């Protein structure tokens, strides 16, 4: 029995060592703004040619931080960078805010300024050796369309591969799975995502109930208001109110990041398989 236990202990120890070696990253840091230029030269593109670019904006988000659209994609990038073997470009924190720009602390960048700036960032990533550029977008509205357009232009002009992911839309089924209903801008899904990242950015005491929310126009295009009357915008009426449930927040974060990582790995694998 003692011999058996000794062998078992040795096996468990060996497995832990192998696991630790497997988990150890091949790069000292995945963040481009933290890595030294000499290590970057040794890593890109020989060890990785994939980069994650978080994009967002500054605008009100109910009872969470104004920079939620930046916080979410950057945290996601850090969570999935190693398993997608990707570097992380610095977050682009200013964007095309739209109908919430009148709220305190919000910033609005025009399309005329935003489009060429994003294009030069993508071109800079190509120049630095990246062939697969993944935009993790945290803000919707007109910004999503511009990112899609610019990413497509760069892919065609520079003969690289681009993928734009609007995480809240991509994870709509996970929202319904975890919360049992649809979500919203600064609603149950986005509030939970931020709560899982940093609960100090969430202020339940400031939530006064449904009067702080407004459902998006239904049917779409039936009405328009600027500024939008609430910073919590429900995708469907009477669904998506913030719940502040930590267990659901943690589960949701894991499901979303797992799904996004899976999409990236599958897409890059198929690009490679096709020789693109």
Task: List where the protein language model places each region.
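Positively charged n-region of N-terminal signal peptides that target proteins for export
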Residues: 1-4
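Bacterial N-terminal signal peptides
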Residues: 7-16
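Extended, histidine- and acidic-residue-enriched regions that form the cofactor-binding/catalytic faces
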Residues: 21-86, 90-98, 104-112, 116-134, ...
């Amino acid at each position: 029995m003692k011999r058996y236990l000794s062998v078992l202990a040795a096996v468990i120890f060996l497995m832990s060592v192998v696991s630790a070696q497997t988990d150890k990253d091949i790069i000292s840091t995945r963040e481009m703004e933290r890595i030294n230029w000499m290590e970057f030269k040794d890593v890109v593109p020989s060890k990785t040619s994939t980069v994650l670019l978080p994009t967002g904006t500054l605008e009100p988000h109910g009872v969470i931080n104004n920079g939620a659209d930046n916080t979410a994609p950057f945290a996601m990038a850090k969570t999935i960078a190693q398993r997608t073997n990707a570097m992380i470009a610095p977050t682009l924190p200013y964007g095309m805010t739209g109908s919430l720009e009148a709220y305190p602390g919000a910033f609005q960048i025009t399309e005329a300024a935003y489009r060429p700036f994003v294009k030069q960032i993508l071109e800079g990533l190509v120049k630095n050796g990246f062939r697969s550029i993944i935009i993790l977008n945290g803000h919707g509205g007109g910004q999503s369309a511009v990112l899609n357009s610019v990413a497509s232009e760069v892919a065609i002009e520079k003969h690289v591969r681009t993928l734009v992911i609007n995480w809240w839309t991509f994870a709509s089924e996970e929202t319904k799975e975890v919360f049992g209903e649809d979500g919203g801008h600064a609603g149950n899904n986005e509030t939970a995502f931020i709560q899982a990242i940093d609960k100090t950015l969430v202020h339940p005491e400031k939530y006064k109930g449904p009067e702080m929310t407004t459902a998006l126009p239904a049917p779409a295009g039936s009405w328009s208001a600027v500024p939008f009357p609430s910073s919590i915008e429900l995708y469907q009426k009477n669904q998506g109110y913030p719940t502040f449930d930590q267990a659901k927040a943690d589960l949701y974060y894991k499901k979303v990041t797992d799904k996004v990582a899976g999409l990236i790995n599958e897409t890059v694998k198929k690009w490679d398989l096709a020789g693109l």
